């Protein structure tokens, strides 16, 4: 979510601030569910400076008990390619994810991305994915296209590669996830319906079967 906001703000010629408040029927992360949390509420804020630096924070909460699911923070830098049209560029960032109170799953990722017309291609490296011993590399392509003033379509494909496992542990297999959806702008609101899931490879065996299934996601958000 924070990286997606950076694509929009990175074209700013002056300092810009953007905040977003939204809700979703279910929380999904890289093609999988994150637990039996039900509907969730998200708030985020981003600041982009003319020199190319940007930063953002976001939080995700359960609706049934207002408990924090996770919090994220990102600091990055974006730029343009002088020889290419202005809608081409690049960005790099550090991203930190915090889960609930104990912090056992907290992890940091480094990101490098290529930005183009209606798409962003990014690679993410985590030395301790979800606080564990495995390092991972995640490559994702996100794209969107406006059909008219109201309707837009969007899609995503991501590939997660695990490094060597800890001693005497089997290596987690790679996997590929996809997402496709359609959105509508209704006044100040953006309403989206999407379907995501794992299309190749397998999730870790310790995850609940429900989290490994594909799912529909209905969401709505407003920017301010």
Question: Where do the protein language model's features map onto the residues?
Answer:
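Repeated loop/turn-to-beta-strand initiation elements of outer-membrane beta-barrel proteins
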Residues: 17-19, 51-55, 82-92, 118-123, ...
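Transmembrane beta-strands of outer-membrane beta-barrel pores
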Residues: 23-29, 59-63, 79, 94-100, ...
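Solvent-exposed loop/turn segments connecting transmembrane beta-strands
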Residues: 30-39, 61-71, 97-107, 127-137, ...
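Detector for outer-membrane/organellar transmembrane beta-barrel domains
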Residues: 105-166
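Outer-membrane beta-barrel "beta-signal"
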Residues: 117, 180-190, 210-224
């Amino acid at each position: 979510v924070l990286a997606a906001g950076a694509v929009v703000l990175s074209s700013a010629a002056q300092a810009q601030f953007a905040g977003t408040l939204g809700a979703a029927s279910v929380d999904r992360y890289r093609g999988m569910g994150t637990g039996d949390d039900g509907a969730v509420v998200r708030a985020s804020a981003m600041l982009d400076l003319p020199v190319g630096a940007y930063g953002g924070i976001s939080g995700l909460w359960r609706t049934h008990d207002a408990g924090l699911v996770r919090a994220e923070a990102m600091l990055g830098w974006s730029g343009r390619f002088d020889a290419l049209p202005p809608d081409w560029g690049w960005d790099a960032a550090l991203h930190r994810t915090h889960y609930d109170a104990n912090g056992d799953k907290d992890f940091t990722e480094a990101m490098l991305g290529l930005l183009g017309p209606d798409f962003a291609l990014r690679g993410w490296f985590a030395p301790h994915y979800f606080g564990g011993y495995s390092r991972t590399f995640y490559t994702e392509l996100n794209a969107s296209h406006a059909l008219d003033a109201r309707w837009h379509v969007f899609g995503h494909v991501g590939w997660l590669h695990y490094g060597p496992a800890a001693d005497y542990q089997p290596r987690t297999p790679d996997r590929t996830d996809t997402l496709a959806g359609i959105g509508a702008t209704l006044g100040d609101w953006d309403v989206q319906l999407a379907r995501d899931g794992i299309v190749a490879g397998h999730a870790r065996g310790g995850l609940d079967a429900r989290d490994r299934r594909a799912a529909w996601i209905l969401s709505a958000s407003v920017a301010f």
